[in-house]
Amino acid sequence: MFGLRRNAVIGLNLYCGGASLGAGGGSPAGARLVAEEAKARREGGGEAALLPGARVVARPPPVGAEDPDVTASAERRLHKSPGLLAVPPEEMAASAAAAIVSPEEELDGCEPEAIGKRPAVLPLLERVSEAAKSSGADGSLPSTPPPPEEEEDDLYRQSLEIISRYLREQATGSKDSKPLGEAGAAGRRALETLRRVGDGVQRNHETAFQGMLRKLDIKNEGDVKSFSRVMVHVFKDGVTNWGRIVTLISFGAFVAKHLKSVNQESFIEPLAETITDVLVRTKRDWLVKQRGWDGFVEFFHVQDLEGGIRNVLLAFAGVAGVGAGLAYLIR
């Protein structure tokens, strides 16, 4: 009985790793067991055999230590290893960003954009032609702009001078008496016609022009150049005529007045260049076929009724002998 109780005490002490529970204390049971195992090793010259009645019991971890997860796989235990901590979130985000913006083999030569940026509001300019969906025999679009050496031709220079002069006159509210240079006599007639027809278009469509101006929201030169999108949209259906052209130039003059009112006169010339670029470089074939500005004058030619009436009255005054008084009143 005593032997059984003694073995139980030794077993309990060995399990708990503490001192002997017997009265008087004595040496720890664990120490005695280690000594006996060492003695058996020395006598046997090999591994110590387990003592009779001794049981192999796993020693629990120290108080406060985390129990090992024996069910965890090798991969899970690896991730929990203190020496292999997870990458901080900010470093992981930076790595992901670098991977996104620099896959040169997938971008096919395109330059990556910085993350978080949107492409500047982008110039969505389309080149419109009378055959927008058909290509030429050489594979190029009929509306392909001319090479740089052909851009500054007579039609372009004449058009730019007429349109620029009209926009400046509308902005200042006064006619420029200086003769046209490149445009010559034909340009002078075209400018006079544009003044007459364009002024009428602005009067008749002022409300619509105001709405279009608000949508453009012009604040800088880049916004001025976006005017080309309005022109492209107008010609998107492939229909070109002088009515549309004069309406667009008239709206350009309306915009020029606005630029003058907000002290942005320096944008008027870029506006005139934008209008000329779209008209001449995308509608060149049509303009040449219509004989350019001579055709414009002929299309909007209106018989000078006031001049005709004046001539009739003067002739009547001379025949009837009414005298110089009537001639003065009707001249």
Curated annotation (Swiss-Prot):
Statement: the UniProt record of this protein carries the keyword Transmembrane helix: yes
SUPFAM superfamilies attached to this UniProt entry: Bcl-2 inhibitors of programmed cell death
Short sequence motif named BH1, residue ranges: 234-253
GO cellular component terms, A-Z: Bcl-2 family protein complex; cytoplasm; cytosol; membrane; mitochondrial matrix; mitochondrion; nucleoplasm; nucleus
GO biological process, alphabetically ordered: apoptotic mitochondrial changes; cell differentiation; DNA damage response; extrinsic apoptotic signaling pathway in absence of ligand; intrinsic apoptotic signaling pathway in response to DNA damage; negative regulation of anoikis; negative regulation of apoptotic process; negative regulation of autophagy
Phosphothreonine found at: T144
Motif (BH2): 285-300
Keywords: Apoptosis, Cytoplasm, Developmental protein, Differentiation, Isopeptide bond, Membrane, Mitochondrion, Nucleus, Phosphoprotein, Transmembrane, Transmembrane helix, Ubl conjugation
Motif BH3: where in chain: 190-204
Spans through the membrane: 308-330
Tagged with keyword Transmembrane: yes
Crosslink (Glycyl lysine isopeptide (Lys-Gly) (interchain with G-Cter in ubiquitin)) position: K117, K175, K178
Post-translational modification: Cleaved by CASP3 during apoptosis, yielding a pro-apoptotic C-terminal fragment.
InterPro entries in UniProt: Apop_reg_Mc1, Bcl-2-like_sf, Bcl-2_BH1-3, Bcl-2_fam, Bcl2-like, Bcl2_BH1_motif_CS, Bcl2_BH2_motif_CS, Bcl2_BH3_motif_CS
Bilayer topology: Single-pass membrane protein
Site description Cleavage, residues in chain: D108, G109, D138, G139
Pfam families: Bcl-2
Family: Belongs to the Bcl-2 family.
Subunit structure: Interacts with HIF3A isoform 2 (via C-terminus domain). Interacts with BAD, BOK, BIK, BAX, BAK1, and TPT1. Interacts with BBC3, BMF and PMAIP1. Interacts with BOP. Interacts with BCL2L11; this interaction may sequester BCL2L11 and prevent its pro-apoptotic activity. Interacts with GIMAP5 and HSPA8/HSC70; the interaction between HSPA8 and MCL1 is impaired in the absence of GIMAP5.
Function: Involved in the regulation of apoptosis versus cell survival, and in the maintenance of viability but not of proliferation. Mediates its effects by interactions with a number of other regulators of apoptosis. Isoform 2 has antiapoptotic activity.
Protein name: Induced myeloid leukemia cell differentiation protein Mcl-1 homolog
Organism: Mus musculus (Mouse)
Gene: Mcl1
